[in-house]
Structure formats: C-alpha cells, structure tokens
C-alpha cells in the first residue's frame, strides 16, 4: 500500500517514476545548472529545494553550495524521501536536511534562506498562492526564488502530428486539473510573486525540438509509457486508446523524420524585497 502522502501523486511514486525522474533530470540538467550558476548560487549558500522528489536536484545543489552551505529539501512523499536520503548518503553529502511536509498544509516560516528552487511543482498544487507565499517567507531579503514551471503545455507535440498522441497530451493536462493543478501555471506566477513581495528579475522561455536520434527523445518516451498506464488507471484512457497512443509513439520513434516539441516552461527568477 502506498503511504498516505504518496497515494494521490498524479504521476505516482513507484520505482518506474523514480527512474523516469532521473532521466528527466539528466535531460534538463545542463539548463538547470546554467541557471543556478547565472543567478550566483555558490559555496556557502543556504538553498531550499521545493518538492525535492527523489533528490536529484537536491544532491546537485548540495555539491554546489559545499560543506559551508546547506540544502533543505521539502517533499511529501515518504517513498521519494527514502530514495533521496539514500542518494545523498551514497554521494557523501552531509549538508542536506529533508523534511516530509505538504506545503499546502504547513508553513515553512521565516528561515532566512539565500535561494529556493522549484521545478514542476506549482503545476500540481491546489494553491499556487500558498506555495509562493511559503517560498517568499522562507527567503531572506534579497533572496532569490527560481522556478521552472510550464506555461504552454500545449506545445507537447509530435511532427508529423499524430491524433492519439494529441489526445494523450490533452488527457494529461485534464488529469492534472482534475486534482487541482494547472499545467500552464507559470502564466500566473509573475503576478503571484509580486503580490508576495517579490520582484521578478527575469523570465526566459525554455522549449526544445528533438528527433529520435537525440538523447532528449528518451524523455517523452519514458513519460508516455508510464502515463499511458496511469491514465488507464484513472479511467481517462481505455485499453484500446492506450494501445493506440503507444502504437503511434512507436511509429514516431521508428521514423527518422519525426520531431517532438517539448511542452514550454518558463524560467522565472524573482527576488524578495
């Protein structure tokens, strides 16, 4: 039986999802680390990792801030926290603290931290307002909040277009909304950050177009396979519809002229005033 905090995860917390999140982190890691370096995260910083998951970004942040810095990872899945703690133990990281908490139910309080990192979390929570307020309150004046959140999930698209994969993307978005999330939440973040006493410093769109020969093609591949099964469980796809999605993806994967555009997200950097 899943732990109470794991049962309602939209994408699940099983081993396959842990592995998929690792692949996802590797695909986007160059973009992420470039962002962290650009905003100045370095030795001695105290960083908050929101929705730390299995700890992929947490461990990278801990290595960047070094032994004189620290990382606080917040995650509500006991399963993910188990994996994250083991990851940090294997990498010899002693500057990481994890807390099992649901940010929709608790307040972090005034922690005086230097920066926060939030990737693909705001799109799943029931109250982005509360999430942003929690983050703002945890930062020191001048502290930075960094977000990678979807703004145009509709750009999830294969070329040539394939009808079952188009419907799959629509059902993914609908499943998030059915649990209180919003796939295009980044559109609202600048206003929410302003209302929480933060100043937006920069916004950058992040989107890629990849072919089957590209490493990043594995990202939609793993996402589709796992989420077809998840959408079947939720009753959003029949077995026949799920099989057609997988058939269309196999056809795209075998076609060297196929292309995939990733769902666009925004890289938002804001500063607490």
Stretches with model-predicted labels:
Residues 1-18, 22-23:
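N-terminal, positively charged/glycine-rich alpha-helical extensions of SAM-dependent methyltransferases
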Residues 183-184, 201-273:
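Conserved Class I S-adenosyl-L-methionine
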Residues 146-214:
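Conserved catalytic/acceptor-binding region of the Class I
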Residues 107-115:
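A short acidic, Gly/Pro-enriched loop at the edge of an enzyme's catalytic core
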Residues 48, 54-106:
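Class I SAM-dependent methyltransferase SAM/SAH-binding core
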Residues 26-45, 60:
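Conserved alpha-helix/loop element of class I SAM-dependent methyltransferases that forms part
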Residues 114-129:
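A short SAM/SAH-binding and catalytic strip from SAM-dependent methyltransferases
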Residues 129-144:
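A short glycine-rich, Lys/Arg-flanked "PGG" loop and its adjoining helix->strand segment in the class I
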């Amino acid at each position: 039986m899943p732990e109470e905090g794991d049962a309602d995860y939209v994408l699940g917390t099983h081993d396959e999802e842990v592995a998929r999140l690792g692949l996802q982190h590797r695909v986007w890691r160059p973009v992420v680390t470039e962002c962290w370096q650009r905003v100045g995260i370095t030795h001695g910083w105290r960083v908050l990792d929101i929705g730390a998951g299995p700890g992929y970004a947490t461990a990278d942040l801990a290595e960047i801030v070094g032994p004189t810095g620290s990382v606080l990872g917040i995650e509500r899945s006991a399963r993910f926290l188990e994996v994250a703690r083991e990851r940090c133990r294997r990498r010899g990281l002693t500057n990481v603290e994890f807390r099992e908490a649901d940010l929709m139910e608790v307040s972090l309080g005034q922690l005086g931290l230097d920066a926060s990192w939030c990737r693909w979390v705001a799109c799943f929570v029931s109250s982005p307002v509360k999430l942003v307020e929690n983050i703002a309150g945890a930062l020191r004046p001048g502290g930075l909040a960094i977000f990678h959140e979807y703004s145009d999930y509709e750009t999830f698209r294969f070329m040539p277009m394939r009808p079952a994969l188009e419907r799959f993307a629509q059902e993914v978005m609908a499943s998030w909304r059915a649990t209180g999330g919003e796939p295009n939440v980044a559109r609202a973040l600048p206003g929410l950050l302003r209302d929480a006493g933060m100043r937006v410093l920069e916004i950058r769109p992040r989107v890629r177009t990849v072919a089957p020969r590209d490493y990043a093609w594995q990202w939609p591949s793993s996402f589709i396979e796992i989420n077809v099964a998840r959408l079947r469980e939720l009753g959003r796809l029949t077995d026949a519809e799920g099989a057609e999605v997988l058939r269309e993806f196999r056809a795209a994967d075998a076609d060297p002229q196929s292309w995939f555009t990733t769902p666009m997200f925004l890289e938002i950097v804001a500063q607490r005033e």
